[in-house]
Amino acid sequence: GIGVKEGAEYRFSVWARGENQKLRIELIRNDTMEERQAFESKELTVNSKDWKQYEVILKSPRTEPKAHLRIFLESAGTVDLEHVSLFPVDTWKERKNGLRKDLVQALYDIKPGVFRFPGGCIVEGTDEATRYEWKKTVGAVENRPLNENRWHYTFKHRFFPDYFQTYGLGFFEYFQLSEDIGAEPLPILNCGLVCQYQNDPDQQVSLSKLDSYIQDALDLIEFANGDVTTTWGKVRADMGHPAPFNLKFLGIGNEQWGPEYPERLKQFVEVLRKAHPEIKIVGSSGPQSEGKDFDYLWPEMKNLKVDLVDEHFYRPES
């Protein structure tokens, strides 16, 4: 269900096409036998053969932890719907497609110095096709693709059969949030390795095919810091932030291990040092805080002269 609160407003939006088709948008309780399940409804008319975005505001008269959204076609005919969304109006800084106020406030209150994103095996993906690609997370929200989440095959106890990510929160929102809470952004990019737990070395991106991955890193720096006359700086400006985000750090690779990692990282370092000596490169010491992989990677990171090494600790509090 969808949790709604008494007195709160929710923005329903949809991309639709059709000729004079009336829709009724409802918030309902489907666990009741009452004749009228809807406790809030609004109408809208789809009046164009071309794709067009429509919005109505629903105001909940009561608190319902498990409400449902229902869309009725009021008359005979055909209407196409795409990118259906129900979103709270009251978000952090009142932004459309914004973040929950209470969660951002909690982040702000702990005064983080660094904010790492997207982090974890999400960066790697289950395979190359499902890796996290930052360019797919910027621009109009309705044009961002759905992607299978890395943890889709891992947790049997999840509440839903499918586990996907919509990229509704992408790199623009991430940089903006980092700015809001006063933290230095630390974006992590794929280094040409997908999940090493699930893939053999011969299934990884070959060293001769890393150019597009390295270009993604260069373009991300341009998106964050570039002038509005540059390709990716203009994308940032068009999204509402002409000023640069002042990116200082860039992580290449998540919790990678073995010789496959430094031999790929080396190519990134060589290009980034020449193109952006001002950016501090962050490497990784792997998924463990000690042991064979850790002991192997630290000297490799020193040889590559990365600026910082991202150590990960998985230990009980004791």
Please give the residue ranges for each predicted region.
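Alpha-helical scaffolding segments of alpha/beta enzyme cores, especially the outer helices
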Residues: 9, 102-105, 173-176, 180, ...
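Alpha-helical scaffolding within the catalytic cores
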Residues: 67, 98-102, 168-174, 223-242, ...
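Active-site groove signature of glycoside hydrolases
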Residues: 72-75, 80-83, 88, 118-121, ...
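Active-site-proximal loop/turn and secondary-structure-junction residues that shape catalytic pockets
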Residues: 29-31, 121, 191-195, 256, ...
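Extracellular and organelle-lumenal recognition/adhesion modules and their flexible linkers in secreted
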Residues: 1-166, 184-186, 199-211, 218, ...
